[in-house]
Amino acid sequence: MRIGSMVFFALCVITGPTFAQNTENDAGKGHDLATLVCANCHVAAADQRFTPILNPPAPSFESIAQRPDTTAQSLEKFMTTTHRGIDNPGGMPNPYLMDYQVKQITAYILSLRK
């Protein structure tokens, strides 16, 4: 039992910084991807180079991040589901992102929380 606890502790110490780096790295990649893919309709970043084509724009990523019901799971589900249809022709289309891209944009949005 004692050896198992020591191994678990060692793994936590070793993988903790790696997990933090991956999250930061994903957020950085998510920022870059969001300014390419999402900024056409959303204010995805303060440093994006153009104004969204929607008037008014879709919710900003910063405002989405501040919502109390925003979680990694809710963002990932939203980004992989179409919200357009006969009853909602103006809804957000499914951007058809790869799983890793969804995780990167999710990490970026969550990094905007204050």
What kind of feature is each model-predicted range?
Residues 6-16:
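Bacterial N-terminal signal peptides
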Residues 16-33:
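Electrostatic cytochrome c docking/interface patches
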Residues 54-65, 78-106:
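Axial heme c-ligation environment in periplasmic c-type cytochrome domains
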Residues 1-4:
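Positively charged n-region of N-terminal signal peptides that target proteins for export
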Residues 105-113:
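Short, low-complexity, Pro/Ser/Thr/Gly-rich segments in the mature regions of secreted, periplasmic
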Residues 21, 113-114:
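Short, solvent-exposed mixed-charge patches
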Residues 48-51:
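Short Cys/His-rich "knuckle" micro-motifs
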Residues 35-45, 105:
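The canonical Cys-X-X-Cys-His
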